[in-house]
Amino acid sequence: MIFDEGTAKNYDEWLKTSQGRYIDKREKALILDLIAPRRGEKLLDVGCGTGEHLLLFKDRGCNVTGLEPSVPMLAIARQKLGGNAELYPGRAEELPFPDNEFDIVSLITTLEFTDDPAKAIGEAIRVSRGRVFLGVLNSCSFKAIQRRFGELFRPSLYRKARFSHIYGLTGMVRQFLPDARIQWGSVIFLPAGWYGFAVGLEETIPVMKNPFGAFLG
């Protein structure tokens, strides 16, 4: 599934809302805790979208590369990053890079829209010489139920999304790396609409090895 210009703009507009900013902050905190990027590391973000996570990693001193199949999203990423990232069109299942090219490879809400998630994971492992981060929409979360219910009444890009759970995700990873050391956690536990008044409650919930947050990494 390739996103059009309207989807790209809607995503960036959502990030400007109070709920979008809070959810984005929580997700990025989990991503940084798990990846622990270091200055000078080479990082590839597969399915980089409009470049939000490339900016995050660039600010941590990484040398960033992004790959994205959507031309409109890639155009926005170029506007945001200028010459501070190498950006390529392409698909997660066919990465145009040699083996062991990057210290870190991330796929953040990318597997949901790939034709072959296992192949995409295998490609990420192939081009990484260090860490691979998989960030997904969690099928075992309250928000996943809300999204699926909402699809019955209005069109949604989530209708074609493939949600994941931790056991399916780790199973795919172990097809390629049977002895991999896997660290994981999740965030965003509350229903949509609660984040105007229940931020304190969200932040009391344990994150690491909690399988019920809407964003799982």
Model feature map: region roles:
Residues 118-132:
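A short glycine-rich, Lys/Arg-flanked "PGG" loop and its adjoining helix->strand segment in the class I
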Residues 109-112:
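Short catalytic micro-motifs in class I SAM-dependent methyltransferases
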